[in-house]
């Protein structure tokens, strides 16, 4: 890392309009404070490791997700392998090892209600306790929050117009 960073963390499946707003907020902070803009995403989706029978169908594969995130102007897309070892890390261990040691984070931008670490015990307060400045950014849509779950439901129902509105682009199927 050339300089300290502002980090946004999430799976970002589909890189929908809510994700895009969160990442744009990251970019604004990076510019304002001369920080490197970093997005952390996980591969595979944590649910594919923690509850494989309940893991959702992906809206896009990792390569497309990275391409979409990078296309927003982020300087680094850091793909963190999600495995049993990472799943067992406490939130404090993750903050220290990934955010502070690996990415030299000073600032973190997260969506409202963001949780991380073993048993999802880490919160915005955990990040603050690690010495990070935290921005909790709301991902609200029209009535309900935009979410990958809502997009999957729209796609399953054949509502490509609604899916495209939430994605900010037409839904794609790779194959």
Indicate residue ranges for each PLM-predicted region:
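Nucleotidyltransferase catalytic core that binds NTPs
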Residues: 1-175
């Amino acid at each position: 890392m050339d300089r300290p960073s502002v980090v946004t963390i999430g799976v970002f499946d589909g890189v929908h309009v809510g994700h895009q707003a969160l990442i744009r907020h990251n970019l604004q902070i990076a510019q304002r404070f001369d920080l490197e803009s970093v997005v952390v995403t996980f591969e595979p989706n944590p649910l594919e490791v923690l509850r494989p029978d309940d893991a959702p169908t992906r809206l896009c594969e990792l390569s497309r997700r990275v391409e979409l995130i990078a296309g927003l102007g982020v300087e680094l897309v850091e793909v963190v392998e999600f495995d049993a070892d990472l799943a067992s890390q406490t939130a404090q261990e993750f903050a220290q090892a990934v955010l502070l040691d690996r990415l030299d984070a000073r600032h973190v931008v997260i969506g409202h209600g963001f949780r991380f670490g073993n048993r999802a015990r880490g919160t915005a307060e955990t990040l603050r306790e690690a010495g990070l400045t935290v921005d909790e950014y709301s991902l609200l849509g029209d009535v309900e929050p935009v979410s990958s779950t809502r997009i999957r439901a729209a796609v399953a129902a054949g509502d490509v117009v609604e899916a495209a509105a939430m994605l900010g682009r037409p839904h794609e199927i790779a194959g």
